[in-house]
Swiss-Prot record:
Function: Catalyzes the interconversion of L-alanine and D-alanine. May also act on other amino acids.
GO BP: D-alanine biosynthetic process
Cofactor(s) the protein needs: pyridoxal 5'-phosphate
Similarity comment: family membership: Belongs to the alanine racemase family.
Segments crossing the lipid bilayer: none
Matches recorded under NCBIfam families: alr (TIGR00492)
Catalytic activity: L-alanine = D-alanine
Full protein name: Alanine racemase
Keywords: Isomerase, Pyridoxal phosphate
Residues holding substrate: R144, M329
Pathway(s) it belongs to: Amino-acid biosynthesis; D-alanine biosynthesis; D-alanine from L-alanine: step 1/1
GO cellular component: cytosol
Single GO MF annotation: pyridoxal phosphate binding
The encoding gene: alr
Length: 389
């Protein structure tokens, strides 16, 4: 993935498409989250999965510049990308580490904070010199990773018996984004507090406690503990419509998120077709009037969902242009008959705003029956990311 700074943005004239990342919008989002954090709780920026499609390397630089003191990722490989940019910043690795003994050369980093579920993983990691910090994952109702119930007691006992030091304890909410009634999340919070109390009974008294992701940070201030993990909303996207409605119900109607990503391309070819012409693979679309067709060099390889074929729009000169025919691997066709000024070289907005019109990740998710997380993370790493404003 190319990471292009704002000083090189003129190079976008040569790209098939490019991503623009708004530094100002990122700063606004961070300020909004910092304003609602409980005292003594800190913010960790989650940059896993190529920073939710935004580009892990440019996002790392922007977050550090914005005063972020801790970054979270999924994998060792992601952590190493960040470590190449900053040699000291603490990095929370949340994905399960496989065969850690084979990665001793890179995991021997005291500023790696590694989340683990299995005692054997902790034993191996704690033997490294220097050893990474270890954060025990608690399954409070997600049913995925972590210890719970009698297994948790056994895990804590085993860790204590072999003298393993813990740096933190964490959990993850299962359904905060999906509901307006949050009894299950409150139950999870109670279970997490019980796990913290149990850990203290084994002598683990000064752990960094963290549970909240984006939605729960907005909705559950009592669960901020020592640290929150902000992912999707760092990038200005709501976790769900239910999250936004739930926040409104709490009386907080002023919390704002600003999407930081725009995805743009250019028209590379114009064709004129008479009525009753077929467009694209499979001849699935037939014109019903003389049609001006614009070709955009973006397709499903670049991350544009094929389900948007004849089912979506892009923006050209501030107007919506309908996608016609099947989206190709590297090209998409638009009906620009109603946009007289559309020509080769005209900028096309795939995600973002152009004049009074906008197309959001949520718009694309609604059209393709998925979530904004998937829309963003599908965007190809090969597309250059350019920092603007």
């Amino acid at each position: 993935m190319q990471d292009i700074n704002s000083g090189s943005s003129s190079m976008k004239d040569t790209y098939s498409s490019w991503i623009e990342i708004s530094k100002r919008s990122l700063s606004n989002n961070l300020d909004n989250f910092r304003s609602i954090l409980r005292p003594n709780s800190t913010l960790t920026a989650i940059l896993k999965s190529n920073a939710y499609g935004h580009g892990i390397e440019p996002m790392t630089r922007l977050c550090i510049e914005a005063g972020i003191s801790r970054i979270g990722v999924n994998s060792i490989e992601e952590a190493l990308l960040i470590r190449n940019i900053d040699s000291k910043i603490p990095i929370l690795i949340m994905g399960e580490i496989q065969n850690p003994e084979k990665r001793k050369d890179v995991l021997s980093d005291p500023n790696f904070w590694i989340v683990f579920s299995r005692p054997e993983t902790a034993r191996i990691l704690s033997s490294f010199l220097p050893a990474p910090k270890l954060h025990l994952k608690i399954d409070t109702g997600m049913g995925r990773l972590g210890s719970h119930g009698e297994t948790l007691k056994q895990t804590l006992s085993e860790l204590k018996n072999v003298g393993i030091t813990l740096g933190g304890i964490c959990t993850h909410f299962a359904s905060t984004e999906d509901v307006l009634e949050h009894k299950y999340s409150l139950m999870q919070t109670q279970k997490f507090e019980e796990a913290i109390f149990l850990a203290k009974s084994f002598g683990y008294n000064h752990l960094i406690r963290h549970a909240c992701a984006s939605a729960s940070t907005m909705l559950f201030p009592n669960a901020h503990f020592d640290m929150v993990r902000i992912g999707i909303s760092l990038y200005g996207l709501w976790p769900s419509i239910q999250t936004r409605l739930s926040l409104n119900l709490t009386g907080n109607k002023n919390f704002q998120l600003n999407p930081i990503l725009s995805w743009k391309s250019r028209i590379v070819h114009i064709q004129y077709h008479p009525a009753d012409s077929y467009i694209g693979y499979g001849s699935t679309f037939q014109t019903s009037y003389p049609t001006k067709v614009a070709i955009v060099p973006v397709g499903y390889y670049e991350g544009l969902d094929r389900k948007l074929s004849s089912n979506g729009d892009m923006l050209v000169l501030g107007k919506k242009a309908r996608i016609i025919g099947r989206i190709c691997m590297n090209m998409t066709m638009l009906d620009v008959t109603h946009i007289p000024g559309a020509e080769v070289g005209s900028i096309v907005t795939i995600i973002g705003q152009d004049g009074e019109e906008s197309i959001t990740a949520d718009d694309l998710a609604d059209r393709t029956h998925t979530i904004n997380y998937e829309v963003m993370t599908r965007i190809s790493e090969s597309i250059p990311r350019i920092v603007v404003d």
